[in-house]
Amino acid sequence: MMQESGTETKSNGSAIQNGASGGNHLLECSLREVRSNGETPSVEIGAADLTHLQQQQALQVARQLLLQQQQQQQQQQQQQQQQQVSGLKSPKRNDKQPALQVPVSVAMMTPQVITPQQMQQILQQQVLTPQQLQVLLQQQQALMLQQQQLQEFYKKQQEQLQLQLLQQQHAGKQPKEPQQQQVATQQLAFQQQLLQMQQLQQQHLLTLQRQGLLTIQPGQPTLPLQPLAQGMIPTELQQLWKEVTSSHTAEEAASNNHSSLDLSTTCVSSSAPSKTSLIINPHASTNGQLSVHTPKRESLSHEEHSHSHPLYGHGVCKWPGCEAVCEDFQSFLKHLNSEHALDDRSTAQCRVQMQVVQQLELQLAKDKERLQAMMTHLHVKSTEPKATPQPLNLVSSVTLSKTASEASPQSLPHTPTTPTAPITPVTQGPSVITTTSMHNVGPIRRRYSDKYNVPISSADIAQNQEFYKNAEVRPPFTYASLIRQAILESPEKQLTLNEIYNWFTRMFAYFRRNAATWKNAVRHNLSLHKCFVRVENVKGAVWTVDEQEFQKRRPQKISGNPSLIKNIQTSHTYCTPLNAALQASMAENSIPLYTTASMGNPTLGNLANVMREELNGAMEHTNSNGSDSSPGRSPMQAMHPVHVKEEPLDPDENEGPLSLVTTANHSPDFDHDRDYEDEPVNEDIE
């Protein structure tokens, strides 16, 4: 069957050749007769004859192609019937058989001749002499001979591939990689020869056009883009197009299933170059236009790269410290590869640039933090007297109205978390709420862990982990809570002193500076707190946490006036009781406690001023030496008196809010950084 199909295709090619040569022979005879009579060729008669001849040639080519397609379909049907009856052939061979019998493409079957319309234009323009017409016919014959040689070469190559595939199938062995590579190289060489032949034809037609033998209108496509002659019936064209497209789809499906490079990919028309040919030679095309446009596309791509490259701008190299002038992007690439190669100097410059970027990122984080604080501040001013968000759980604003003061002793502060807000320095200890008006109470600073009376949890740090790692802000936790958290996060629930230091510096950017200050505080807290237990093991001395002892220190003792206890019970979630030392100081100075009954007293502001002066007077005799129990404040006061800090008041309010920050160092219930004995609490407070 394969040999029969090969002989049929050869006979078809010879028929096409005879038809085309016969048409050209008739044209030559007519021209010789005209020349022998000594007459000039008539434009009308010559155009009609040429049109008729070209239509005859095109019809012959189309009919031959249709007949070939029908014969191949019949052969395939017969083969399928034989395979169903005998059942001897494998399904793989059945799948490969349609792919092997590939029809010759339309571009191969149709000679690249001049269309009737173009020949008519040549005759109407009367620019060709009989000698020029004879030369043109000779050139057309040479083109047809080239086409025939190309077809024969194509058929030979296809027969060789069929024989190789049949031998491999009969042997029952898969082709090895060297054989596959050899077949692939042969196919590539064949495709390159096809492209070279098409390029030669294209160049020949272009030379004819340049010599003035052919004229193409601006709206008319180029010569190779002309499919069949335009004298065919539209129904025949549609049928021919359907046959060709169906054969191409079948060939592509077969080639995809077998994942083998088949010659069917080359069987496309001259107007649509194959993908493999484009991959082999991207600068070659059947219409000769791709090679003209590819340099422009490359130049455009280089321009885009030059605009987008971060190291090149305005003709200057943007490498740090270089600023070399480069004429174009190509010279810049050469300069980049030669001057800035991978060496010690480039590596050092890259490290410097990394440090610059890190500093800029830190500065950006600070600027963002400042912007957030400004926005928060403006938001606070615009929403007064409502409860407003304050920076990072450190400040709580308490608002008391007249109705609220009558209904409850104190209103509940509102402290939403704003992790991007700035951190303000605070001091440890309970806050004393002193009201100078019936309408509001100023912001009260207190420590997060003291305010909520719960130990630090991993969720508190994990929630703002990235913020603490990048921003140099003071974490709102005591050193004892941070040390406990570091030990609990370790796998063995024990850490050496150096490992505790490393945890501090790894989790908080604030501790990467001033190491001497906070490391001393960590050592003092480890030695003074009973909840931290030192254990000797193989590594050396490690520190563990006694949770029971740590939890014993957390609950706060409530003592003093029953009215104070009542107030604390009503607002125990957010408010803390007065310090015992503060109560004793108030009792000595005969300052009554502020309850709901005394809030309406008109002399409340005077009493608050007296208490503030008395407490601030005791501050002058304190000793500033001692260990710092919080990363966010100055060292603790080791003496008994209490330090009260006055918050700035609003200038436009006569009776503005008063907020006091107290630091009580004698009570272990509030001081989680020192271990002192409980002092006797004065119970005679009125």
Curated annotation (Swiss-Prot):
Entry function: Transcriptional repressor.
SUPFAM superfamilies in alphabetical order: Winged helix' DNA-binding domain
Biological process, per Gene Ontology: motor neuron axon guidance; positive regulation of DNA-templated transcription; regulation of transcription by RNA polymerase II; ventral spinal cord development
Entry superkingdom: Eukaryota
Assigned GO CC terms: nucleus
A family per Pfam: FOXP-CC
InterPro entries registered for this protein in UniProt: FH_FOXP1_P2 (IPR047412), Fork_head_dom (IPR001766), FOXP (IPR050998), FOXP-CC (IPR032354), TF_fork_head_CS_2 (IPR030456), WH-like_DNA-bd_sf (IPR036388), WH_DNA-bd_sf (IPR036390)
Protein name, entry field: Forkhead box protein P1
Region (Disordered): 1-23, 279-306, 403-440, 619-686
Low complexity: bias regions: 413-427
Comp. bias (Polar residues): 1-19, 279-292, 403-412, 428-439, 621-632
Notes concerning its domains: The leucine-zipper is required for dimerization and transcriptional repression.
Location of region: Leucine-zipper: 357-378
Residue stretches of biased makeup (Basic and acidic residues): 295-306
Annotated DNA-binding residue span(s): 474-564
Biased composition (Acidic residues): 676-686
Localization, UniProt: Nucleus
Zinc fingers (C2H2-type), renumbered ranges: 315-340
Keywords from the UniProt entry: DNA-binding, Metal-binding, Nucleus, Repressor, Transcription, Transcription regulation, Zinc, Zinc-finger
GO molecular function annotation: DNA-binding transcription repressor activity, RNA polymerase II-specific; RNA polymerase II cis-regulatory region sequence-specific DNA binding; zinc ion binding
Annotated spans, CTBP1-binding: 391-395
PROSITE patterns to which the protein is assigned, alphabetical: FORK_HEAD_2, FORK_HEAD_3, ZINC_FINGER_C2H2_1
